[in-house]
């Protein structure tokens, strides 16, 4: 059964929610790979203009942070409430994003031992670089669609 959710733009008031959720989900990985959690780093990287809040039953249950860059789109963060892990919401959110941006490169960085890595690989992301316990991954543009748009059948 498909779970219903909606997505709304974030505002400054969502900062604490996003901070707490990210720390809850990622603290162990940050400690294992980078020696600890640095609150100032999260604050420095948080831009509500790039963040969308996932809502279910009128409650925040996660967020997605993406920004355009010179290569296409960069997924800065996707976090869901632990109670939703493994229930298909993250897959659906990412599939919709990939469909909207199918003609662009979509990049992300993840820890090599992050369980979400399997999801990214299943959705077609490939590893382009392995560095200090992290993986740079990319989903290549849909070449068929790109070539049709350019008239190169």
Predicted regions, residues:
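A short, internal acetyl-CoA/4′-phosphopantetheine-binding micro-motif in the GNAT/acyltransferase core
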Residues: 78-85, 110
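C-terminal "cap" of GNAT-fold acetyltransferases
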Residues: 69, 104-117, 121-153
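Conserved acetyl-CoA-binding loop-helix of GNAT-fold acetyltransferases
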Residues: 86-99, 118, 122
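A glycine-centered beta-loop-beta connector
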Residues: 14, 55-59, 72
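Conserved beta-strand in the GNAT
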Residues: 59-67, 74-79
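Conserved GNAT-fold acetyl-CoA-binding loop/helix
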Residues: 19-45, 49
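A short beta-loop-alpha structural element at the N-terminal edge
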Residues: 5-20
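Short hydrophobic/aromatic beta-strand element in the GNAT-like acyltransferase core
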Residues: 50-53, 63, 77, 107, ...
């Amino acid at each position: 059964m498909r779970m219903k959710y909606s997505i709304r733009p974030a505002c400054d008031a969502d900062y604490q929610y996003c901070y707490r959720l990210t720390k809850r989900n990622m603290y162990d990985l940050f400690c294992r790979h980078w020696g600890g959690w640095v609150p100032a780093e999260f604050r420095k990287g948080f831009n509500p203009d790039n963040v969308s809040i996932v809502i279910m039953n009128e409650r925040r249950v996660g967020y997605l942070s993406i920004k355009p860059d010179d290569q296409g789109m960069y997924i800065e963060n996707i976090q869901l409430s632990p109670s939703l892990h493994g229930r298909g919401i993250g897959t659906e959110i990412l599939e919709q994003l990939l469909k909207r941006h199918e003609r662009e490169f979509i990049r992300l960085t993840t820890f090599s031992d992050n369980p979400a890595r399997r999801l990214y690989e299943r959705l077609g992301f490939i590893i382009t670089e392995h560095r200090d316990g992290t993986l740079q991954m990319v989903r290549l543009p849909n070449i068929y669609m790109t070539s049709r748009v350019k008239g190169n059948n």
